[in-house]
Structures are given as C-alpha cells and as structure tokens.
Amino acid sequence: MKVIAVTGYKPFELGIFKNDHPGVECIKKALRRKLTAFVEDGLEWVIISGQLGVELWTAEVVFEIQVEYPDLKLAVFTPFLEQEEGWKEDNREYYEFILSQADHVDSITKRKYESPEQFKLKNQFFIEKSDALLAVYDEEKPGSPKYIVEAAKKKGEIENYHSYFILFSDLQDIIEEEQWNNAE
C-alpha cells in the first residue's frame, strides 16, 4: 500500500468544539499508531480533503511522523475551491497552516461550491487514487464519512481495496490505557 485516504467525523459530530479537547489527542494517538504501522510497511502518501476534524488532525499526525519518516507525504485534495469560506477565523487560520505545510494541495473540481455532487466526486476521486481507506468511523454512529466508507466497501468487493477503521471501542481502549499509565 503506497497511498491511503484518511477521513472521519467532523468535530461537532464528536461533540468537540476546540482543538485542545482531550478527545482530540486520543484520536490523534489512534491515527499515529495506525499510520506509523502503515509507513513501516511502505506507505508513501496520506491524502485528505482538508475538512475540519479527523482529516486536519490526521495532517498534524503526518507532520509529527515526518520527523522520523521524512519520505511520508501529505496531499490535500479539496472537493472545491475556498471550502474554508464561511468558517470561523481560527479554523481558517488552522486550515491555511495545514495547507502551507502539505506536500501537495489541489482542488478536485477546480470550482467554488456549486452542489453536493462535488462531495460525491471527491469520494470517487479518493477511492480511485488510493490503495486503502482509514476512517475514524463507527457504523453504530453514522455521520459525514458514511458515503466514502460505503464507496470504499463497494470497491473492496470487486478489487483489492482495504478499509481500516478506528472505532469508538478503539478510542475507549486508548483512554483506559492512558488512565492505567497515569495511575502508576
């Protein structure tokens, strides 16, 4: 596997409204573990669409991993131009920082937002251009990643395409591990 697409919930879907929420570090730790293992097995590129939440936290994790594995690259393919338009200023600044550090940035449709069809095109692009999908997603709590997860599963039924998941139970295990380590 050379290219993995990463996605997951938006912050509000997780009840997270600030990047310093303790849940963010837990999610980043889970992402770090998965991505580091993939890098050690030959992963070269991580691709995200730049949406707030899991995707931008993934970018931060990639930047951390690049210290030890500088050949790992991050690409941000936005579904449309100026997707950050209308975001709060601190979220725009955070997003612009991530874009400034990414190895590749492009827009899939090369137009500003016109219709939900652009999200469908984004999902198709990600599944076509990647070897696997990693999603912070639990089918017990459907949310915005549902459609790309379904597309990945369909591709996996007909080709060698893998979907990997970080479930709520995985995050709970990390929380319990942290509590155990802090109690010692």
UniProtKB/Swiss-Prot annotation:
Alphabetized SUPFAM superfamilies for the sequence: MCP/YpsA-like
Top-rank taxon, per record: Bacteria
Record-stated family: Belongs to the UPF0398 family.
Originating organism: Bacillus cereus (strain AH820)
Database matches in Pfam families: YpsA
Protein name, as recorded: UPF0398 protein BCAH820_1652
